[in-house]
A protein has these predicted regions:
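Short, glycine-/aromatic-enriched active-site segment of Class I SAM-dependent methyltransferases
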Residues: 150-168
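Class I SAM-dependent methyltransferase SAM/SAH-binding core
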Residues: 61-99, 104-107
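Short alpha-helix
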Residues: 168-184
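Conserved class I S-adenosyl-L-methionine
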Residues: 1-48, 51-58
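A short, conserved alpha-helix within the catalytic core of class I
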Residues: 127-137
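Conserved beta-strand signature within the Rossmann-like core of class I S-adenosyl-L-methionine
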Residues: 141-149
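A conserved beta-strand element that flanks and buttresses the S-adenosyl-L-methionine
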Residues: 119
């Protein structure tokens, strides 16, 4: 379960994190291009699976809403940070009838087959119990998409910076991701490298 420090950190910095998605050219100049690469990767999985219902877990300000709504997909976005939820609801108003935003954390996800795809971008970075999160997502949807930072210098620097504020940061190698899938009742369908930023992973629920 995320700590109170986690919720506070992202609540206090909601505007800053939202700003990362305002301009792709600027983001790429600042070395944040993978933020847009992983958005496109998630949308691609939604298209390939012909999904109609998507859970956007840790939706932040809602950068995934517009591209999914453009496909006619119904999106449920959840986030524990009140300021993020406020921004996400503002974005959801641009897509009436297609996007719903709920103020809750991943530990409350207990729906079964309520969605076709569950997405968590920029979430596994901070989760101390990733198998629990992936397992819940795999119950809620057959297909799961998640981003995972690589354990390089960038992650080490984030670990120091965020750790000073009580927020844990984790890094993953492909072997870690494979073990995580096995422990969560999932299989790895595809791993897409995101350069130094890590990986975007498409999981599928393992056959019973």
């Amino acid at each position: 379960m995320p700590s109170a420090e986690f919720d506070t950190y992202f609540h206090d910095r909601a505007g800053r994190f939202s700003a990362f998605y305002r301009s792709e050219p600027v983001a790429r100049l600042l070395g944040r291009g993978p933020l847009f690469d992983r958005l496109r990767g998630a949308v691609t999985v939604v298209e390939q699976t012909e999904a109609r219902r998507v859970l956007d877990l840790g939706c932040g300000s809602g950068p995934l809403f517009a591209p999914l709504a453009a496909l006619g997909v119904h999106v449920t976005g959840i986030d524990p940070a009140p300021a993020m939820v406020a921004l996400a609801r503002r974005e959801a108003e641009r897509h009436p009838g297609l996007v719903v935003v709920q103020a809750r954390g991943w530990e409350t996800v207990d729906e079964r087959d309520a969605y076709d795809v569950a997405v968590a971008l920029g979430v596994f970075d901070y989760v101390d119990e990733p198998a629990g999160l992936l397992r819940r997502m795999g119950v809620a949807a057959r297909h799961v998409v998640g981003s995972f930072p690589a354990p390089g210098l960038r992650t080490q620097l984030r670990r120091v910076r965020y750790g000073a504020r009580g927020v844990h940061v984790h890094g993953y190698r492909p072997g870690d991701i494979a073990r995580l899938a096995a422990a969560s009742g999932m299989t790895v369908e595809k791993i897409t490298p995101l350069g130094r930023a890590g990986y975007l992973v498409h999981f599928v629920r393992a056959a019973a």
